[in-house]
Amino acid sequence: MCIRDSPFATEDYNIKELAADVAGIITALDEESAVIVGHDWGAPVVWHTALLYPEKIDAVVGLSVLYGGRSENKPERPVRQDPEDEFFYISYFQDPGVAEAEFDADPEALIARLYASRSPGTPVHPPEITDARAIAGGWIKRLGEPVHLPAWLSERDLKYYVSEFRKSGFEGGINYYRNGALNWELTPELDGSKIQQPALFIAGELDIVNRGATQDELELRAQPHFEDLRGVVLQPGIGHRNQQQAPEDTNRLLIEFLGSLN
């Protein structure tokens, strides 16, 4: 049985609630402001916290996911896939209870396979499910089981992650994926807004999130949305989880950025 102290309502995971949580943590720590860092889905959270709570945020760093501004058009709400359509994990997440049940039943398999699939150079066995159609099954068996864990992931760390997810379950995290359209509806005031604070973006060169974009391409994408972007850094040979695959380099970049602040 999962033990959780996070909200159950899907809409409680919208971007405004999450940004308010970050601002609330700063207040709870009895600090006036802070520099914040977020990776993957944490990056949109810190970007939006900087926009929505400028008085609380001195500077901001995003890893993997670059801020691209508020879209002109409302995102379509993903719908459950037709069973004959090609499997897509975000669509799989839209049907409440389905993905959670699969992941909660075997968190170790999910985490080990997912981390290996995002770690260049880690060998994996062929996936059990090779049929691309949604009807063929869920996500875990579409990911190859790693021959061994990625070099940056120890058995001890994996066991810790698994034990924590056994307590919390995956529903909260998956609910994040169910709020794309609501996030847009809740943030009309951000139309055309730029992040004013000093900012840094770091990504692995091989991170699939950025689809092979070069540093110049990422800088061009970022330019309209930042007032003081102090760097776009691609870490050579690194994949999605750059803070774990390249901790020393990531820490160096963060320390240099902090040193550049007034």
What are these regions (language model features)?
Residues M1-I3:
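Short, small-residue-biased leader/transition segments that mark boundaries at the very start
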